[in-house]
Amino acid sequence: MSCPYAGNGNDHDDSAVPLTTEVGKIYGEYLMLDKLLDAQCMLSEEDKRPVHDEHLFIITHQAYELWFKQIIFEFDSIRDMLDAEVIDETKTLEIVKRLNRVVLILKLLVDQVPILETMTPLDFMDFRKYLAPASGFQSLQFRLIENKLGVLTEQRVRYNQKYSDVFSDEEARNSIRNSEKDPSLLELVQRWLERTPGLEESGFNFWAKFQESVDRFLEAQVQSAMMEPVEKAKNYRLMDIEKRREVYRSIFDPAVHDALVRRGDRRFSHRALQGAIMITFYRDEPRFSQPHQLLTLLMDIDSLITKWRYNHVIMVQRMIGSQQLGTGGSSGYQYLRSTLSDRYKVFLDLFNLSTFLIPREAIPPLDETIRRKLVHKSV
């Protein structure tokens, strides 16, 4: 197959030398364009009342589903690479590359929403009656993306029925069940973080050193507050320091952390959270450079999915208002708005790491043993 965009602009070039004598597929055959470009069936046209914007609606959603397929393809490969006891530098680099690809795809999907918004509410109303009972709620691939990423069933907002019950065919339900049982990206990243070098109590023991640094940092703040000449200002500062102390206690006390996990306010295990904090502090060390990029990209993915949900919510409100039911029977706008909460944010703990930062000068210094260990780039 030759690419029509790679030549010099001429349709025919008698001097061209074929790279192979084998007969290959031409462009349209390779991409199966006959099937792809014949998959836009306008129901308004079948009803002899063609609505121009229905074609845009179909094309846009088909494009979403194609990109969803690519995201799933990337997630599955990343999960395979993470599902190992040791991940060397080449694999980490490949994981970062593929996560970045997902980020760029999601940016593209966010930017597709304004194209749909070129359609007015009245234009949409002209063909909306043909859509029922179809609904974006029935996008199997988007549900698989959520599950493979790590959205927990118990965290989902439930409307009318369980999310998997909207799929009538058994194959789709099996796909949902398998995606719920298979290790998610969240689970695999958690296992990986738990193995962060430097957490070992018999080694560098970062967590104990971090606690000592926090205690010294807070004590220095208390001493500074006690020198405040205005009593009201002094009491305010002391109260603020005590609140910060309670925040730190939520990560230093395993029982408090586990209670927050059970409540749904945290996602990572206590050990994994320690690993994430350590990588954040020492991200300039060679061994932690790529892991830090990986964690940043996971937050980017969460952020972009949230942006996509938000853009979708605003578009739905523009098209059908906030009171109507969706075409699939869900509460439309109200349901979509409820998915914008932190309960759908998979890597919530990474966003909240900044809560536990301390000044750079207070970060525990690395000893020579761990510094040498962090020069070798495999995690």
Curated annotation (Swiss-Prot):
SUPFAM superfamilies per the UniProt record, alphabetical: Indolic compounds 2,3-dioxygenase-like
Top enzyme class: oxidoreductase
Family annotation (InterPro entries): Trp/Indoleamine_2_3_dOase-like (IPR037217), Trp_2_3_dOase (IPR004981)
Protein residues bound to substrate: F57, I58, I59, T60, H61, R128, T327
Pfam families (UniProt xref): Trp_dioxygenase
Catalytic activity, EC: 1.13.11.11
Entry's cofactor comment: Binds 1 heme group per subunit.
Pathway assigned in UniProt: Amino-acid degradation; L-tryptophan degradation via kynurenine pathway; L-kynurenine from L-tryptophan: step 1/2; Pigment biosynthesis; ommochrome biosynthesis
Residues reported in the UniProt entry to bind heme: H312
Domain of life: Eukaryota
Intrachain disulfide bonds: none
Keyword ATP-binding in record: no
One Gene Ontology term of the molecular function aspect: metal ion binding
Required cofactor(s): heme
GO annotation, biological process: L-tryptophan catabolic process to acetyl-CoA; L-tryptophan catabolic process to kynurenine; ommochrome biosynthetic process; protein homotetramerization
Keywords assigned by UniProt, alphabetized: Dioxygenase, Heme, Iron, Metal-binding, Oxidoreductase, Tryptophan catabolism
Catalytic reaction equation(s): L-tryptophan + O2 = N-formyl-L-kynurenine
Function as written in the Swiss-Prot or TrEMBL entry: Heme-dependent dioxygenase that catalyzes the oxidative cleavage of the L-tryptophan (L-Trp) pyrrole ring and converts L-tryptophan to N-formyl-L-kynurenine. Catalyzes the oxidative cleavage of the indole moiety.
Assembly: Homotetramer. Dimer of dimers.
HAMAP family: T23O
Family recorded in the similarity comment: Belongs to the tryptophan 2,3-dioxygenase family.
Protein's name according to its UniProt entry: Tryptophan 2,3-dioxygenase
Gene: v
